[in-house]
C-alpha cells in the first residue's frame, strides 16, 4: 500500500507460507507499478518445489529457469507470463556478477554480460520475495541484488527469524559484534504467526521435549 520500504513475515513451518507467498506474487503480478516479481529461494530443490506448488495453485503460473541465460531472458522479457519468476539466489547472483568466468568470456567475445543485459531493469520497480530469509540472505549475492536494484522492495518469509540473541557472533576490530539480523535486512516485521499460535489453533501438532544428561562420556557414547 505504501509503495516503499521492506518487510518480513514470520510464519511457522506448516502454516502455509508457500500459499501466502503465491497469493502475494499474483497480487503483485497485477500491479501495473511493478515491473517484475521475483521469488528467490536458496536451494535448487526448493526452486523446483516452489514452481510445482505455484503451478498447483494456478496452472502455468511460472516457468522453469534451467540456467542463468534463461533467467536473464525472462527478466528482460515484457511478456506478462514472465512477470513472476521463481529462481535461486545463486542464479540471480551469478547474473549480477561481472567478474565471474562466464562474464569474462562474454567480454572477450565482445558480447554483453548478463549484468549489462539487465541494465534496463536497474531503476525499475521490482518486488523481490525471499523464501527462508533466515538462511542465505546475509551473503554477497544478497548485497549484489540490493545494490543492482536500488528501487526494489524486499520481502522475506521465514519460520525462524534471526534476532540478536540467536545471531552468530564474531570478533570485529577487536570487539564482539553480531552478524546481521533479519530486521537489519528486511526492516519491519509485517506479520507473525509463530509455533505457539499454530499449536493454539491446532494447525500443527504439539510436541514434547525430554532432556537427558549422561553421567559421563562413556554413558553418552553408549547411548548414542
Feature-to-residue mapping (PLM):
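Pre-Walker A (Motif I) flank of P-loop NTPase domains
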Residues: 2-8, 35, 82-83
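Conserved RecA-like helicase motor-core motifs
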Residues: 8, 36-38, 51, 57-72
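Walker A/P-loop
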Residues: 3-24
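Interdomain helical connector at the RecA1-RecA2 junction of SF1/SF2 helicase-like NTPases
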Residues: 167-224
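Conserved Walker A/P-loop ATP-binding site and its immediately adjacent core
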Residues: 18-20, 33-56
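Conserved motor-coupling elements within RecA-like helicase/translocase cores
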Residues: 69-85, 99-103, 120
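Conserved helicase ATPase motor motifs in RecA-like P-loop NTPase domains
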Residues: 12-13, 132-136, 148-167, 202
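SF2 helicase catalytic motif II
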Residues: 104-110, 114-155
Amino acid at each position: 500500500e505504501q509503495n516503499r520500504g521492506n518487510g518480513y513475515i514470520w510464519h511457522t513451518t506448516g502454516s502455509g507460507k508457500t500459499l501466502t507467498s503465491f497469493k502475494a506474487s499474483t497480487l503483485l503480478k497485477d500491479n501495473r507499478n511493478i515491473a517484475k516479481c521475483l521469488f528467490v529461494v536458496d536451494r535448487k530443490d526448493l526452486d523446483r518445489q516452489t514452481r510445482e506448488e505455484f503451478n498447483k495453485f494456478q496452472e502455468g503460473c511460472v516457468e522453469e529457469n534451467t540456467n542463468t541465460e534463461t533467467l536473464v531472458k525472462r527478466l528482460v522479457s515484457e511478456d506478462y507470463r514472465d512477470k513472476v519468476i521463481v529462481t535461486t539466489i545463486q542464479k540471480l547472483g551469478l547474473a549480477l556478477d561481472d567478474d565471474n568466468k562466464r562474464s569474462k568470456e562474454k567480454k572477450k567475445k565482445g558480447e554483453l554480460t548478463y549484468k549489462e543485459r539487465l541494465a534496463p531493469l536497474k531503476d525499475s520497480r521490482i518486488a523481490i520475495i525471499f523464501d527462508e530469509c533466515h538462511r542465505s540472505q546475509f551473503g554477497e549475492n544478497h548485497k549484489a541484488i540490493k545494490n543492482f536494484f536500488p528501487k526494489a522492495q524486499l520481502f522475506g518469509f521465514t519460520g525462524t527469524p534471526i534476532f540478536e540473541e540467536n545471531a552468530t557472533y564474531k570478533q570485529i576490530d577487536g570487539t564482539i559484534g553480531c552478524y546481521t539480523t533479519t530486521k537489519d535486512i528486511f526492516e519491519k516485521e509485517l506479520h507473525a504467526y509463530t509455533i505457539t499460535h499454530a499449536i493454539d489453533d491446532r494447525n500443527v501438532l504439539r510436541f514434547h521435549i525430554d532432556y537427558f544428561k549422561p553421567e559421563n562420556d562413556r554413558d553418552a557414547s553408549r547411548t548414542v
